[in-house]
């Protein structure tokens, strides 16, 4: 990958790349990121704020709403929508510092959004991947995934929505007592997640997205520049088409997302 001499050149690169990959018809952009390779290509002093702005501003300036995971995995105690940090990466923490950000209420799997339709993530249901979750709300909403420096084969959380919708027997619904606060006011508890079973000694039910990601490429829905193995990829793929492919894949092989075979019961 070429070196970026300034943040403006980085901004220009992403603006041009998003357009070439076909972002124009989409209203929502759900982003997965790993900036290690891109950060190493900046010749200017690395400043987190400028770096993240250069990557996201081209989307905001094009009237897109950007959605980014801000998972905190707060399984007990208190989750504050405004104060609890994310345990993910640079972009994930950056978005929480933006003045216009909206963040969802789920204490384990929250999402943050900026842009004209950022309200989509607010006041969601208590299921992390099921009814009235972010993943359900994005269906039919002209949404695309954009992977920046993160290979698709590493996995996407949409697969858990598919598992829950299709009734994967290797996961179960777990309710958490974490108390959720918004602007210092208690808004509720009893949020749920569809988590891995731990009662089968011969299987850990860890996921493997390699086969499923190949299906996405084979279906021709992934537009991409850069090289995933070098973490320099920018990959854009349609949300609804991705979900349709994953649902069909699961119904054909209920262990498609697992690291080893398992017979549903």
Name each model feature, range by range:
Residues 1-265:
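N-terminal and secondary-structure boundary signal
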């Amino acid at each position: 990958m070429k070196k970026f001499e300034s943040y403006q050149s980085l901004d220009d690169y992403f603006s041009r790349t998003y357009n070439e990959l076909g972002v124009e018809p989409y209203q929502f952009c759900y982003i997965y990121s790993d900036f290690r390779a891109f950060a190493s290509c900046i010749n200017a002093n690395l400043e987190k704020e400028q770096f993240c702005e250069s990557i996201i501003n081209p989307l905001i300036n094009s009237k897109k709403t950007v959605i980014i995971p801000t998972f905190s995995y707060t399984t007990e105690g208190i989750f504050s929508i405004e104060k609890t940090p994310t345990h993910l990466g640079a972009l994930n923490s950056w978005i929480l510092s933006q003045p216009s950000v909206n963040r969802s209420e789920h204490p384990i799997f929250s999402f943050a959004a900026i842009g004209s339709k950022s309200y989509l993530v607010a006041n969601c249901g208590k299921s992390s991947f099921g009814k009235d979750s972010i993943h359900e709300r994005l269906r039919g909403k002209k949404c695309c995934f954009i992977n920046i420096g993160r290979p698709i084969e590493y996995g996407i959380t949409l697969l858990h929505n598919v598992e829950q919708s299709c009734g994967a027997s290797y996961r179960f619904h777990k309710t958490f007592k974490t108390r959720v606060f918004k602007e210092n006011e208690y808004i509720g508890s009893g949020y749920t997640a569809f988590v891995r079973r731990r009662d089968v000694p011969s299987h850990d039910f860890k996921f493997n997205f390699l086969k499923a990601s190949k299906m996405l490429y084979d279906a021709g829905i992934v537009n991409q520049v850069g090289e995933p193995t070098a973490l320099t990829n920018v990959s854009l793929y349609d949300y609804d088409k991705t979900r349709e492919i994953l649902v069909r894949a699961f119904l054909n092989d209920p262990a498609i997302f697992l690291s080893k075979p398992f017979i549903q019961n």
